[in-house]
A protein has these predicted regions:
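Short, compositionally biased P/S/T/A/G/V-rich stretches that sit at domain boundaries
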Residues: 1-13
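Short edge beta-strand/loop segments characteristic of extracellular beta-sandwich folds
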Residues: 17-25
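Conserved aromatic beta-strand anchor motif in extracellular beta-sandwich/beta-rich domains
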Residues: 35-39, 78-80
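Solvent-exposed serine/threonine-rich low-complexity stretches and specific carbohydrate-binding patches
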Residues: 34, 43-55
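Aromatic sugar-binding surface patches on proteins
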Residues: 54-63
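Short solvent-exposed strand-capping/beta-turn motif centered on an Asx-Ser/Thr pair
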Residues: 24-28, 83
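Surface-exposed, short loops/turns at beta-strand junctions within beta-sandwich domains
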Residues: 63-73
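Short acidic/polar inter-strand loop motif in beta-rich domains
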Residues: 80-90
Length: 97
């Protein structure tokens, strides 16, 4: 099972950072994704219930309010946990304006 961040967009009109994730190699809907953004010792989290999608599992709606994220580069990683599986994505960098 692999956890992969597939989307990271600043949505200015909605004042949020949107993170999308896919878990390949599994197809289930009883897991949870937790995204953690960190910068200068501050951590902010966003959580979503996983969604079953034929040949994979997804979390496409992980969102952080930009009010909670100061301007600069944030490190973001996503953990997946279910009764059967656990996994962690690679960390990505996201620039917040």
């Amino acid at each position: 099972m692999t956890v992969k961040i597939t989307q990271s967009d600043i949505e200015d009109d909605l004042n949020q950072l949107h993170i999308g994730v896919q878990m390949t190699g599994i197809s289930e809907e009883d897991g949870t994704c937790t995204a953690t953004a960190t910068r200068k010792g501050k951590s902010v989290t966003a959580t979503q219930q996983a969604i079953y999608n034929v040949n994979r599992t997804e979390c496409g709606g992980l969102r952080f309010s930009l009010d909670d994220l100061s301007s600069g580069t944030w490190k973001v990683a996503v953990a997946y946990e279910s009764p059967k599986y656990t996994g962690l994505s690679k960390t990505i960098s996201v620039k917040v304006p």
